[in-house]
Amino acid sequence: MYNIGFTTVTFRKKSRREICQIASENDIKYIEWGSDVHLPPNDINALCDVLSLQEEFGLTAVSYGTYYRLGEENYSLWESITDTANAIGAKIIRIWQGTKASADVNESEFLSMVDETRVLADIASQKGLTVAFEFHNGTNNDNGKSSVEFLKAVNKQNVKTYWQPFSTDDDINNLKAVIHYLACVHIFEWNENGKRYSLKHGSKKWQEIFKIIDESKTNPYLIMEFVKHDSKRQLTKDLKHLRVLTRD
């Protein structure tokens, strides 16, 4: 059985309470809190609100979706981020692997990011937290090969990766490459130009994806992200179809 949830960045314009109500309406127990709008680090009022809402709606924080990027080397900020994740009960902190595509990262930059990641991981480990990289274009974590190369170089048990589709022919190979380092899957259906569709539109592809994940026995969290028209109704439809696809 998969642990299915969604991320608050799905509805950046909605309040924290509205998001928790949507989770409740869809029988969702797991949530990823984004740090850009709904839970900034060092915002005690937002934190207190999140803790109250999680208790009221019976929600468990899966991860803290931050926008910390390797290269910042801002360890005081990182301490605040880990404190926030720890406070809400999240075991995963999502960060970004630099600001350059893997093809543009030189050896010195690569090694510097490895060193920074080790420091971040050690701080996170003291609080029982896992660091997981967003799988995204425009970062070093933009394909399976570069992702695994970096994770092996870091060589920390509490450093993993997300995976998400790029709507290209490389999606399946990328997934297979990172499968044993997988913490979470961001789920959405769109084309290479960013046009959004219902999850059902990509059923055949997602069936293959879940077959690979099933066989790996890695059991990552499945986190719905973007939906067509930013629609609450579309999220409900996509979650229903996701449960069909995963037999959940």
What are the residue ranges of the model-derived segments?
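N-terminal pre-domain/capping segments
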Residues: 1-92, 125, 156, 180, ...
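Acidic/histidine-rich catalytic cores of soluble enzymes
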Residues: 30, 61-64, 121-206
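P-loop/Walker A phosphate-binding loop and immediately adjacent motor/lid segment at beta-alpha junctions
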Residues: 197-222
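Acidic-and-aromatic substrate-binding clefts and catalytic sites of carbohydrate-active enzymes
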Residues: 9-16, 34-46, 67-76, 101-105, ...
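Charged helix-capping and loop-helix junction motifs
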Residues: 43-49, 75-81, 106-118, 144-148, ...
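A short helix->loop->beta-strand "cap" motif at the edges of active sites that frequently abuts
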Residues: 59, 90-91, 129, 215-221
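Active-site groove signature of glycoside hydrolases
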Residues: 90-105, 127-137
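Conserved active-site loop/cleft motifs that coordinate metal ions or position small ligands
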Residues: 184, 220-227
